């Protein structure tokens, strides 16, 4: 079973962003091309994902489509949760068909997050860590630290990210999702 261990931090100014980019590369992280991502979040027909702390989304990265399920967060300091992501066929026709299938099954769209993501990768303490700089429409800039691990590696992965966040000089992490931040603290208001 795979678990995503994640920490997210807001970046208040452009100077913070430039300084962080420099620090990331000093750690030997390898930069990759920026990606445009569009995430459509779906509500389950008979389960309140806000109450169960689950996520189901359709993600578009360029022409590629992904369906992702994230289970409840199981850590009080990071966003550690089970994650299942399945790549689907590419293209807008497939995206429309996937959405049609989901809505036919009773799922309904509840919100969309659009971002430009610049990923960096590095190996640290035996973990492949992805550091991403996200420019989220309507929210601004954030940095995420993320790694995927199995159940036995969760504690070590968490400590790896804590140490990296301290060394990068990141402040207090933001545990709310981009969708929750965009919708406000109470998603039932919309």
Q: Where do the protein language model's features map onto the residues?
A:
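N-terminal strand-loop-strand beta-hairpin
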Residues: 1-126, 162, 168-190
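Coil-to-beta-strand transition motifs
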Residues: 2, 126-128, 138-142
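A generic structural motif
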Residues: 11-13, 147-153
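C-terminal accessory/tail domains of diverse enzymes
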Residues: 49, 139, 151-153, 190
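Residues forming anionic-ligand binding surfaces in small-molecule and nucleic-acid pockets
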Residues: 70, 74, 136-144
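Extended, acidic-biased charged interface segments
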Residues: 140-149, 160, 164
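Glycine-rich, acidic/polar active-site loops that bind/position phosphate-bearing ligands
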Residues: 156
């Amino acid at each position: 079973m795979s678990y995503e261990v994640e920490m997210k931090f807001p970046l208040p100014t452009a100077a913070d962003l430039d300084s962080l980019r420099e620090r990331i590369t000093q750690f030997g992280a390898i930069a990759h091309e920026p990606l445009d991502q569009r995430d459509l979040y779906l509500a389950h027909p008979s389960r309140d994902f806000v109450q169960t702390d689950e996520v189901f989304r359709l993600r578009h990265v360029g022409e590629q489509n992904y369906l992702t399920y994230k289970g409840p967060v199981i850590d009080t300091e990071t966003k550690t949760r089970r994650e299942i992501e399945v790549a689907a066929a590419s293209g807008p026709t497939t995206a429309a068909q996937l959405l049609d299938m989901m809505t036919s099954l009773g799922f309904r769209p509840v919100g969309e997050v659009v971002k430009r993501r610049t990923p960096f990768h590095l190996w640290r303490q035996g973990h492949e860590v992805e550091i991403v700089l996200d420019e989220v429409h309507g929210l601004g800039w954030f940095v995420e630290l993320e790694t995927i691990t199995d159940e036995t590696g969760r504690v070590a992965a968490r400590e790896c990210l804590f140490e990296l966040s301290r060394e990068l000089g990141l402040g207090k992490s933001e545990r709310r999702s981009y969708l929750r931040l965009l919708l406000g603290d109470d998603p039932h208001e919309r």
